[in-house]
């Protein structure tokens, strides 16, 4: 129980980590020195390499990067072409719908016209035979 009450009093204060002090000059700093020397060596070798490389090799290296950028452009070009193809197909579908609708309207008008022509009657209520015969002749001509 005593431990439990002491932990509740410790809750108000946070535990602090180890306190670091600055190392004296004579302390061991081998790892840090090795890392620093390694970085210096890498920088020197890079500098030496770029001094000795011919300008032609720079151009070759640069052209390789350009080709890669060009391939990215071709990818974008490919996406653009796909979207254009989709747009073109959609436009063709819309045109086909409009054309079909116009044909349907034309057929309906023709049917209405023939129905009116065939339904005409004389004063006595008899159908006008001239219209009937013309309609039958038109059908025969259409089939042959």
UniProtKB/Swiss-Prot annotation:
Biological process (GO), any one: maturation of SSU-rRNA
Main location: nucleus
Keyword Acetylation: no
Compositionally biased spans, kind Polar residues: 1-11
Pfam families, per database record: rRNA_processing
Segments forming a coiled coil: 72-124
Annotated protein name in UniProt: rRNA-processing protein fyv7
